[in-house]
Curated annotation (Swiss-Prot):
Principal location: secreted
Keyword entries, A-Z: Carboxypeptidase, Cytoplasmic vesicle, Disulfide bond, Hydrolase, Metal-binding, Metalloprotease, Protease, Secreted, Signal, Zinc, Zymogen
GO biological process assignments: proteolysis
PROSITE patterns membership: CARBOXYPEPT_ZN_1 (PS00132), CARBOXYPEPT_ZN_2 (PS00133), PEPTIDASE_M14 (PS52035)
Active-site residue list: 378 (proton donor/acceptor)
Propiece span(s): 17-110
Cell compartments where the protein resides: Secreted; Zymogen granule lumen
Protein name: Carboxypeptidase B
CC per GO annotation: cytoplasmic vesicle; extracellular space
Amino acid sequence: MLAFLILVTVTLASAHHSGEHFEGDKVFRVHVEDENHISLLHELASTRQMDFWKPDSVTQVKPHSTVDFRVKAEDTVAVEDFLGQNGLRYEVLISNLRSMLEAQFDSRVRTTGHSYEKYNNWETIEAWTEQVASENPDLISRSAIGTTFLGNTIYLLKVGKPGSNKPAVFMDCGFHAREWISPAFCQWFVREAVRTYGREIHMTEFLDKLDFYVLPVVNIDGYIYTWTTNRMWRKTRSTRAGSSCTGTDLNRNFDAGWCSIGASNNPCSETYCGSAAESEKESKAVADFIRNHLSSIKAYLTIHSYSQMMLYPYSYDYKLPKNNVELNTLAKGAVKKLASLHGTTYTYGPGASTIYPASGGSDDWAYDQGIKYSFTFELRDKGRYGFVLPESQIQPTCEETMLAIKYVTSYVLEHLY
């Protein structure tokens, strides 16, 4: 039995490196002060293969900011030489990405089956959606809202006590494949809803008076790919005629200033906006569902990582939303509540000025559909681990995020429209 468990451990650990192994890859953080520094990074990106972690692309780099990016092992010396010769201040956040990837799995022996305190692959999450619905029929129902490019079923969980004409909160996770903490939170939220209903006054009130539409993984194809082939994959896995490059950035594919700023029309770019708004089956499924339930959905919450931010519209424009003061006040209260548990500090504000301009985002689109409480959460951390947050941080991350989500939900309930 012990030999079997060890085999399972080794198999799981190696599965994430069956394609890209990331041995010797480094993640750098560069301190950008001015336009000259930005030009130098553009020059570097044109000669070396750089995987931008924050922001998503070199085109989104702003003065007086920090830039995190991954470099393949064979390019690390050249990149460090370039940064040093040009006076760009930097530090190495991750000196060997493979070691960090293996360390994200805290338990040496991986249990089979679903766990809320570990990262689960799609097969496990899919089975969990069926099980959690069948075990809690008075609180949860599961429905299919579409299929992905590769034919995987997109499952949605409706969480709430049965009732007619109930207002709703829509929450999705897993837009970007490598942001594993995001689907972990959606699963945690469902667990907490079931566990605390009838025991905790706020959750009981929420589920009596509201429905939560929870989409645990939007980009299923990409998420699967991060488990089997390339842990750092971001986009979907769709293909298109005339290009050898794969995938679209789902969070550039919505009809909100589509492909106008902070997005690329190059299929090989990490921020490729797609051939048209809602060209991807996944974004179309989300948009269709929301359009069909627009009269009931009062808040839209989309969960990403990393950088510890709570963002609201707009990202495709520097204009402020009509209820900017209200959204700012709500975000301020939510991040204060979040920080009260573990002291985790979040920045908050409109997307374009707080993080970077980006068009085609789901939060902007939802807001423009009339959903006035629309927020993006960028979960832990601020770059020490980035996209490879250890499993030991799942519980504290989810616990504190729950406080913010519940704060927003309480406000929405008190300000129905």
